[in-house]
């Protein structure tokens, strides 16, 4: 599979489901979601469904759901502004025309005296030609601004993010990472159904034709008891022992059809990174079945998550170097290497990256979902929200930190791969 396509498909899928989690829970809470975006930068494709514009942007390195009220509204109607009003069948303001009013001859033009488009949903002003009479108009809950011919939905306060309960906001933010864990689980269950679930029993699975194990007379189903006199209690024991003995003869005692046999195998020496290890051309056995696959999906998701959390802890304590982190360039190279081995391994990589994305997003760093959740938990404990300006300042610092970290990691990737 072409590496670029594989990278875009994997990364795009992970981002899509992450942002979909945010979108679904936000919409359930009644929050107006203005945009659901995959990628950053200029739009290359977009369409609108119901209240939300769905876009694909040029740089496939993330995504976002733009919820009303998270940022200051871009369009304001202040006293002294001249706007045009269009009405619905209930005589409520349906559209407020900000500019190019000449294109809407049916609009009632007023000079605004007062406008409350969040709580009271009313706009008051003087009609052109009747400046002595102040008129007040009720504004529909589903009204729009029209700016440069484009409609922008007005967000009453009850449709804004900060109007919702702390619990509703926590669910909307946490849903993104949770969706990544669910996606990884589903992928792993699919892999279990497609190829079986790897077993850690000390039993041989399929053998590679002309591999060292096959040449030595070993067969699928052989239960390994000892290697060089050491008891083999699991497949992991077998792998570790074989890895440690490249091109060194091993005495293997096994059971086959209730008969004890002794075989001699010399593992092939192969390069694995900077070291040489032994392999003997045998796979571990697999178990099949729906329940087995469901269980495997859960345990493997938990195992991978635990491993990632452990490594993050080592990063904090200095046991794990920042040079070992991979950014977009490193992930692209990883995708290139894995793509050469087939679709199954690409799916495994996608599951790993999905879990990784979920965990990283839960880190309590401002600008990440975890940082936003931290603010919400503090609000729940205090009983009142954190000052918006202070929160914005902390988020700015978080964004700067993440940008710096991304630059460092990307530079490390480039040095490691190309220099």
UniProtKB/Swiss-Prot annotation:
The active site is at 19. Its main location: membrane. It is a multi-pass membrane protein. It is found in: Cell membrane. GO terms for molecular function: metal ion binding; metalloendopeptidase activity. GO terms for biological process: proteolysis. Zn(2+) binds at residues 18, 22. Residues 184-269 form the PDZ domain. GO terms for cellular component: plasma membrane. Its EC number is 3.4.24.-. The keyword Amino-acid biosynthesis does not apply. Its cofactor is Zn(2+). The chain crosses the membrane at residues 4-24, 173-193, 349-369, 391-411. It comes from the Bacteria. SUPFAM superfamilies: PDZ domain-like (SSF50156). Keywords: Cell membrane, Hydrolase, Membrane, Metal-binding, Metalloprotease, Protease, Transmembrane, Transmembrane helix, Zinc. NCBIfam families: RIP metalloprotease RseP. Is responsible for Site-2 cleavage of the RsiW anti-sigma factor. This results, after a third proteolytic step catalyzed by the ClpXP protease, in the release of SigW and the transcription activation of the genes under the control of the sigma-W factor. Belongs to the peptidase M50B family. This is Zinc metalloprotease RasP. It comes from Bacillus licheniformis (strain ATCC 14580 / DSM 13 / JCM 2505 / CCUG 7422 / NBRC 12200 / NCIMB 9375 / NCTC 10341 / NRRL NRS-1264 / Gibson 46).
């Amino acid at each position: 599979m072409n590496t670029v396509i594989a990278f875009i498909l994997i990364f795009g899928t992970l981002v899509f489901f992450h942002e979909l989690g945010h979108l679904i829970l936000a919409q359930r809470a009644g929050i107006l979601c203005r945009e659901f975006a995959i990628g950053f930068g200029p739009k290359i494709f977009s369409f609108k469904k119901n209240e939300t514009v769905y876009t694909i942007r040029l740089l496939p390195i993330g995504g976002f759901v733009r919820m009303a009220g998270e940022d200051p509204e871009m369009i304001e109607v202040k006293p002294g502004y001249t706007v045009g009003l269009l009405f619905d069948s209930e005589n409520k303001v349906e559209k407020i025309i900000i500019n190019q009013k000449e294109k809407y001859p049916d609009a009632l033009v007023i000079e605004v005296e007062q406008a409350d488009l969040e709580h009271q949903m009313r706009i008051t002003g003087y009609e052109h030609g009747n400046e002595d009479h102040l008129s007040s108009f009720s504004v529909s809950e589903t009204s729009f601004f029209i700016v440069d011919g484009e409609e922008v939905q007005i967000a009453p306060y009850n449709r804004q993010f900060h109007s919702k309960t702390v619990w509703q906001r926590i669910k909307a933010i946490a849903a993104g990472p949770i969706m990544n864990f669910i996606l990884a689980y589903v992928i792993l269950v699919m892999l279990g159904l497609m190829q079986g679930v790897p077993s850690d029993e000390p039993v041989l699975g399929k053998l590679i034709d002309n591999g060292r194990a096959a040449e030595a007379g070993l067969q699928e189903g052989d239960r390994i008891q000892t290697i060089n006199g050491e008891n083999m209690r699991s497949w992991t024991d077998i792998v570790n022992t074989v890895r440690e003995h490249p091109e060194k003869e091993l005495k293997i005692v096994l059971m086959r059809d209730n008969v004890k046999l002794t075989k001699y195998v010399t593992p092939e020496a192969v390069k694995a990174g900077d070291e040489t290890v032994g392999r003997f051309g045998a796979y571990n056995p697999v178990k099949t079945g729906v329940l087995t696959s469901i269980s495997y999906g859960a345990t493997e998701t938990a195992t991978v998550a635990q491993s990632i959390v452990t490594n993050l802890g080592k990063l904090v304590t200095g046991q794990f170097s920042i040079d070992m982190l991979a950014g977009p360039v490193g992930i692209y190279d990883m995708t290139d290497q894995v793509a050469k081995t087939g679709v199954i391994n690409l799916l495994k990589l996608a599951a790993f990256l999905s879990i990784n994305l979920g965990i990283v997003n839960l880190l309590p760093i401002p600008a990440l979902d975890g940082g936003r959740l931290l603010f919400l938990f503090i609000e729940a404990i205090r009983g009142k929200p954190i000052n918006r300006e202070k929160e914005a300042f902390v988020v700015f610092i978080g964004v700067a930190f993440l940008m710096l970290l991304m630059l460092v990691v990307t530079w490390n990737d480039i040095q490691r791969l190309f220099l």
